[in-house]
Amino acid sequence: MQEIYRFIDDAIEADRQRYTDIADQIWDHPETRFEEFWSAEHLASALESAGFTVTRNVGNIPNAFIASFGQGKPVIALLGEYDALAGLSQQAGCAQPTSVTPGENGHGCGHNLLGTAAFAAAIAVKKWLEQYGQGGTVRFYGCPGEEGGSGKTFMVREGVFDDVDAALTWHPEAFAGMFNTRTLANIQASWRFKGIAAHAANSPHLGRSALDAVTLMTTGTNFLNEHIIEKARVHYAITNSGGISPNVVQAQAEVLYLIRAPEMTDVQHIYDRVAKIAEGAALMTETTVECRFDKACSSYLPNRTLENAMYQALSHFGTPEWNSEELAFAKQIQATLTSNDRQNSLNNIAATGGENGKVFALRHRETVLANEVAPYAATDNVLAASTDVGDVSWKLPVAQCFSPCFAVGTPLHTWQLVSQGRTSIAHKGMLLAAKTMAATTVNLFLDSGLLQECQQEHQQVTDTQPYHCPIPKNVTPSPLK
């Protein structure tokens, strides 16, 4: 493996500036779910220029694509994302909340880094395949709409991963370690009520309030929370209250629900009960109700064999060396965080490493930027979050790591993260992830026994728990409204 590590390290460092430029350019063009046309084409055309064969409009999603190089088996996929979040515009390298354009988008989850690291890994693996004449195929999967859109779930449904043997990805974090926990499955759907408008004082008896129906539905689901499993979550947002005039009986209103639980069967059960509450609310108010299924994703299925192989590569490369300017800026960011933010970050570290992870987290209570790789241990912990990587993981072996791109304590989906996402701190973490994925991919090409063991582990689970795509066939991806 030492020769592989040297080759990958040299290959990625040789193009270091190119990769940081691409990450920054995507940061400069933040686009939300299923509207990432600039970002997708930027990556696709760059891969095309690098000698990859690019297929666009994959899975009937205009900004999803596959870039492929090589021939035959095995086929190893590197999963890239590039979507941003609404309302998180923020100036880069600034330790106070200062938007570039108020109310506009920002890369609050570091997906400008996520997609670029997978891009860099794919280029490095291509160079290795060319250098050594090794058989096999490396693919970059351009996956839009992770944030609230479950883009990969739609892609899985359309069969675009059917011939893939294994997949690797990563996520920007405040520490270096493995993403080795289960996640929550979810369903997101909206209920739109229609009633009859009327003068709220003169003729309220003639009106039928859609807003009342939404209020009754939210009240009912809040009572339902007492009667669902402990690890389930039911979130909602009233996306249309009917208007701003209280003297009108509101003729339309809408509420969006996100239902989560460790298993999709539990999510589906809760979803069915919420749907009945909606019907009851419509009945009580003499309104009509229409449900629009938005998206869903499955829980994440870890593959311990592949995780171990990826962890070996991550441990070899180790955490980046930070300079005094980076440490000083990270301290400024930490000064804006709460003690709860910091503790939550440490809890996330601890959750991935068993008992050693807890000791590791305690040791790093005062750490500014991660300076060692967190321990790895197979764990039954469930991360209280969701990812559409979950659906890929039920189709084939998947492993993913975390890489340090932010100050310890930085919460996801915040201005602090956006600010750090276009700095040398983020760039260093991104390139560590790229090297880790590339080296693990080469290892899979060379070690057929390793790949077979990964697939056997995967099959042992899916033989007894077969995968069913949670998104109905008639549902199509929808941009953020």
UniProtKB/Swiss-Prot annotation:
Say yes or no: keyword Manganese present: no
| Protein's UniProt keywords contain Hydrolase | yes
User: What organism does the record attribute this protein to?
Assistant: Escherichia coli (strain K12)
Sorted keywords for this record are:
Hydrolase
Induction details: Could be transcriptionally regulated by AbgR.
Cystine pairs = none
**EC number(s) given by UniProt:** 3.5.1.-
Cellular component GO terms held in the UniProt record = catalytic complex; cytoplasm
Task: Report which gene this protein is encoded by.
Answer: abgB
> What GO MF annotations does this protein's record show?
dipeptidase activity; para-aminobenzoyl-glutamate hydrolase activity; protein heterodimerization activity
Protein name from the UniProt record: p-aminobenzoyl-glutamate hydrolase subunit B
Query: Which segment of the chain is annotated as a signal peptide?
Result: none
Instruction: Describe the protein's quaternary organization and the partners it interacts with.
Output: Forms a heterodimer with AbgA.
Q: What does this protein do?
A: Component of the p-aminobenzoyl-glutamate hydrolase multicomponent enzyme system which catalyzes the cleavage of p-aminobenzoyl-glutamate (PABA-GLU) to form p-aminobenzoate (PABA) and glutamate. AbgAB does not degrade dipeptides and the physiological role of abgABT should be clarified.
